[in-house]
Amino acid sequence: MKKYNRIFTIVVDSLGIGETEDSKEYGDIGVDTLRHISESVESFNIPNLQKLGLANLHSINHVEPVEKPLAYFMKMKEASVGKDTMTGHWEMMGLKIEKPFQTFTDTGFPQELLDELSKRTGRSIVGNKSASGTEILDELGEHQIKTGDMIVYTSADSVLQICGHEENEIFGLDELYRCCEIARDLTLKDEWKVGRVIARPYVGMKKGEFKRTSNRHDYALKPYGTTVLNTLKDNGLDVISVGKIKDIFDGEGITESNASKSSVHGMEQTLEIMDKDFKGVCFVNLVDFDALWGHRRNPIGYAEELEKFDVNLEKLLNKLKEDDLLIITADHGNDPTYKGTDHTREYVPFLAYSPSMTGNGLMETSNSFATIGATIAENFEIDMPKNTIGQSVLEKLL
């Protein structure tokens, strides 16, 4: 069987392609991130995704299917319970999450947790509600500058987020990270457990001028079991992460990490990594689609971000070697035309391409995201870890 020396797996964060049979159980009716983005703009220029076969896989306004797509493609349905970042990525690497991470979206965090966090950090706490990052800064940024109080908030995800002004005399990065480490320790308790604690540094001095910086840091839970990434690393293969992949897996199974300032930067980093001689996986997360456009319900911004991605995708396609494999996918949906600000439970795309391929076309829908991890494992002739899921499609990539 043909083996690939390098596999580039790119997660276009939140690029869902239509509701699943169980979407209604998650409050998501009629959702379709990609389709609804395309219906919100007057033109949509993604020629390289089109060339791979994205419009053959799923109906996209302004983008026609092509007669001979370059890639193999299919829809994947999440087997795990949930629709968040960690669940999606962990499943890609073989873990099925049976119990969703708890959220505090509607209630805020328990007073007992806040009291303990305040006591251990020595700071008063304001916020304690679900909000977008821009909203919470406009509301409480000036207050923090005056008082030094810690801004704590959450979202539709299983997260506890803390905002801190980057300038030391006001709050400072070191102090923000210290507070987040304390929060992570506290939220390991079952009744307070969240998937991630996120440090959200910002700059600016008044409402309307506050901006979050790229010094964000995620303090994630370790995966609940051994993933394909661990097995790759244990077998001497390279696992190079770009974007928030390292944070999502709490560093487990990663041999080299690259933090990104934006999704465009993430693609630029990936293009640089392509010049390296390595054997293994480059695992990329491009978060701006989700963070800047999906949650903020901005379909036009989302479409423009996809067009920027497509420009760099052309460069990537041109740099692929005969023994490279490219996989493009997503971790959940986030329909920017849907009510609220939450992720949406959707199918995600699987596009697989190598310059050495002689075939192409539609494959049968996968019943889990773990197809990715299983395919990677078979390619590098390593066993799937115990208690993992996933069926490889390597033999179908001709």
From Swiss-Prot:
Keywords: Cytoplasm, Isomerase, Manganese, Metal-binding. Pathway: Carbohydrate degradation; 2-deoxy-D-ribose 1-phosphate degradation; D-glyceraldehyde 3-phosphate and acetaldehyde from 2-deoxy-alpha-D-ribose 1-phosphate: step 1/2. It comes from the Bacteria. It is an enzyme of class 5 (isomerase). Mn(2+) 1 binds at D13, D331, H332. It is found in: Cytoplasm. CDD domains: PPM (cd16009). The keyword rRNA processing does not apply. GO terms for biological process: 2-deoxyribose 1-phosphate catabolic process; 5-phosphoribose 1-diphosphate biosynthetic process; metabolic compound salvage; nucleotide metabolic process. GO terms for cellular component: cytosol. Pfam families: Metalloenzyme (PF01676). Mn(2+) 2 binds at D290, H295, H343. HAMAP family: Phosphopentomut (MF_00740). Belongs to the phosphopentomutase family. NCBIfam families: deoB, PRK05362.1. Isomerase that catalyzes the conversion of deoxy-ribose 1-phosphate (dRib-1-P) and ribose 1-phosphate (Rib-1-P) to deoxy-ribose 5-phosphate (dRib-5-P) and ribose 5-phosphate (Rib-5-P), respectively. This is Phosphopentomutase. It comes from Clostridium tetani (strain Massachusetts / E88). The lineage of its organism: Bacteria, Bacillati, Bacillota, Clostridia, Eubacteriales. The gene is deoB.
